[in-house]
């Protein structure tokens, strides 16, 4: 039986994931190469302390990668658990990436669940945290893998200046550009050590109906700087802020 045939049977739930795949720790270069090729963010902000690969039993082909890093942000661990950033007992799931041949299968949950089992065996990590972009999804994969849900991140705004910088230092009073709401993220955590207490309140898990819509431009693709009476392309939706000279508005 070919790998393609096995994946087809697996996608129809006629055989189990453990009959098709196995999981093992992989090197950072292996993870980087795979993630760069298949993840929508490419190699942007790629942080990795440990990585695990999903391999086909027959042929040993790498089909998925999970990467774990130290939580990003100077106060991340303090906010979650009251820990300092010098404490290395908590990981953040930084990437979860699959080959397109596994689209519409539950191989992703098999990889994530198996990766956490491996971390448990190693006995060094007390929890795994992750954030799900609220305008993209609600973190269904984390719910399937028994992560606990701890609500949304706080509401914040970002300043996009006309010269392409985001949140430049200093006063923005005389700087051309726009303030836009930052996408809020769903907080999830898998607590390995039950003695580790999360400071955020556990909440009911969100459903797909609670996916938030970006309020940056309300789908128009343009944003307005009312201080200088200027219109720009929406940097959230278009990837960059560009002045629109002749919008006719």
Please tell me what each predicted stretch does.
Residues 218-221, 238:
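Cys/His-coordinated zinc-binding microdomains
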Residues 35, 49-73:
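Conserved beta-hairpin
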Residues 224-232:
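Short linker/helix segments within small regulatory modules
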Residues 182-194:
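A conserved mid-domain beta-alpha-beta active-site/ligand-binding segment of alpha/beta enzyme cores
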Residues 211-214, 231:
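Residues immediately within or flanking Cys/His clusters that coordinate Zn2+
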Residues 22-25, 67-180:
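Acyl-donor binding region in acyl/amide transferases
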Residues 5-47:
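Short amphipathic alpha-helix that is part of the acyltransferase structural core
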Residues 237-247:
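Short Cys/His-rich micro-motifs in 6-15 aa windows
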């Amino acid at each position: 039986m070919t790998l393609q045939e096995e994946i087809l049977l697996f996608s129809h739930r006629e055989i189990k994931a453990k009959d098709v795949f196995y999981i093992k720790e992989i090197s950072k270069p292996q993870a980087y190469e795979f993630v760069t090729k298949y993840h929508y963010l490419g190699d942007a902000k790629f942080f990795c302390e440990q990585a695990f690969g999903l391999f086909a039993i027959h042929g040993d082909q790498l089909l998925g990668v999970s990467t774990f890093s130290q939580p990003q942000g100077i106060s991340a661990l303090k906010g979650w658990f009251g820990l300092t950033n010098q404490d290395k007992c908590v990981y953040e799931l930084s990437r979860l990436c699959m080959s397109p041949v596994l689209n519409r299968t539950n191989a992703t949950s098999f990889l994530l669940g198996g990766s956490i089992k491996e971390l448990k065996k190693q006995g060094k990590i007390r929890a795994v945290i992750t954030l799900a972009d609220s305008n993209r999804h609600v973190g269904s994969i984390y719910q399937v893998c028994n992560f606990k849900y701890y609500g949304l991140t706080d509401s914040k705004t970002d300043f996009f200046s006309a010269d392409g910088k985001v949140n430049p230092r200093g006063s923005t009073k005389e700087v051309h550009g726009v303030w836009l709401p930052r996408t809020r993220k769903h907080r999830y955590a898998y607590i390995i050590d039950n003695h580790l207490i999360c400071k955020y309140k556990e909440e009911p898990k969100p459903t797909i109906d609670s996916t938030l819509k970006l309020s940056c431009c309300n789908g128009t693709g343009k944003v307005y700087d009312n201080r200088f009476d200027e219109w720009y392309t929406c940097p959230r939706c278009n990837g960059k802020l560009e002045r629109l000279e002749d919008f006719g508005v």
